[in-house]
Amino acid sequence: MGVPKRKTSKGRRDKRRAHLALSGPALAKCPQCNEMRLPHRVCPACGYYRDRAVLEFEEE
């Protein structure tokens, strides 16, 4: 089994992790109400998914 000959330096370790940064969530505009929502999910503002009302909201 391969064993490291030298301790990996902090610089080399951090260079390797340069591309591991997290990005924000991908958002899409709801065609019904123009609110931002997660793609492939029901819009939490209006309850529509693929031009159909999936959730019912109570009127106050």
Curated annotation (Swiss-Prot):
GO terms for molecular function: structural constituent of ribosome. Residues 1-19 have a biased composition (Basic residues). Coiled coil: none annotated. It holds the Pfam family Ribosomal_L32p. SUPFAM superfamilies: Zn-binding ribosomal proteins (SSF57829). Signal peptide: none annotated. Keywords: Ribonucleoprotein, Ribosomal protein. Residues 1-20 are annotated as: Disordered. HAMAP family: Ribosomal_bL32 (MF_00340). This is Large ribosomal subunit protein bL32. It comes from Syntrophobacter fumaroxidans (strain DSM 10017 / MPOB). The lineage of its organism: Bacteria, Pseudomonadati, Thermodesulfobacteriota, Syntrophobacteria, Syntrophobacterales. The gene is rpmF.
